[in-house]
Amino acid sequence: MRSLTLVLLILISIQAALIMGGHTQAQASANQHAATQNSPRLYSQSKEDLHYDELIPTVDPKLFNKRRYRSPRVVFSDVITAEKEMGTPRRPRIRRKANDFLHRGEYSVCDSEEHWVGNLTHATDLGGNEVMVLPHFRINNVVKKQLFYETTCRVKKPIGAPKPGQGASGVKAGTSSCRGIDSKHWNSYCTNTHTYVRALTSYKNQIAWRFIRINAACVCVLSRNSWRHGLKY
């Protein structure tokens, strides 16, 4: 009786060992197959990252040693963050007065919006040349990003289906009329105005500081209606 029990225990242990060995082998083959499938993707991804790193230009650190005028609308960061998380540049605080309630109900002639631009690649300098802006550059083996703080006219979203030529973004800057303007006697539209800021650019394979033009405000442009049109009213 004891011998029969021992034989059964030996057979059960052998069967369990075979099952575990087969499961381990199947798992190893599955892992190897998955690694074989993922290896081309990882290789292609690493190859793309390597190619992207090669395209980032290297900047001489001496360019940042000179103390020159720097615009608050230009920021250099070695932490690549989203433009929405950057916030707005610091502005002087305005102390409120007791008669501030008298100014309630005032509206801007044109609505504007402010945002950070981190993918600016081309711009116009003071000489009218089309220069290449460096959105990324390497300095002291550290990759930094160049960000610009722009103010543009707010784009109105169309009600219903967009008109041909407008797309999903709505009315373009320069096509919306100004607020509070008498349309019987005046033609008006909101448009972007520009300012020049000092940025790191490349022109004719030479990296240097140059003043480039970016959007800085949204203003109203007026033009008087024709004399005949005015006589009708």
From Swiss-Prot:
Propeptide residues, chain positions: 20-97
InterPro entries listed in its UniProt record: Cystine-knot_cytokine, Nerve_growth_factor-like, Nerve_growth_factor-rel, Nerve_growth_factor_CS
Keyword Lipid metabolism: no
Protein's cellular compartments: Secreted
GO molecular function, one term: nerve growth factor receptor binding
Keyword tags: Cleavage on pair of basic residues, Disulfide bond, Growth factor, Secreted, Signal
Pfam family, one: NGF
GO cellular component: axon; dendrite; extracellular space; synaptic vesicle
Leader peptide range in chain numbering: 1-19
Disulfide bond sites: C110-C190, C153-C218, C178-C220
GO term, biological process aspect, one: modulation of chemical synaptic transmission
Its job: Recombinant ZNT-7 was able to bind to the human p75 neurotrophin receptor/NGFR and to induce tyrosine phosphorylation of the rat NTRK1/TRKA receptor tyrosine kinase, albeit less efficiently than rat NGF. ZNT-7 did not interact with rat NTRK2/TRKB or NTRK3/TRKC, indicating a similar receptor specificity as NGF.
Similarity comment text for this entry: Belongs to the NGF-beta family.
Name of the protein in its database record: Neurotrophin-7
Organism: Danio rerio
Organism lineage string: Eukaryota, Metazoa, Chordata, Craniata, Vertebrata
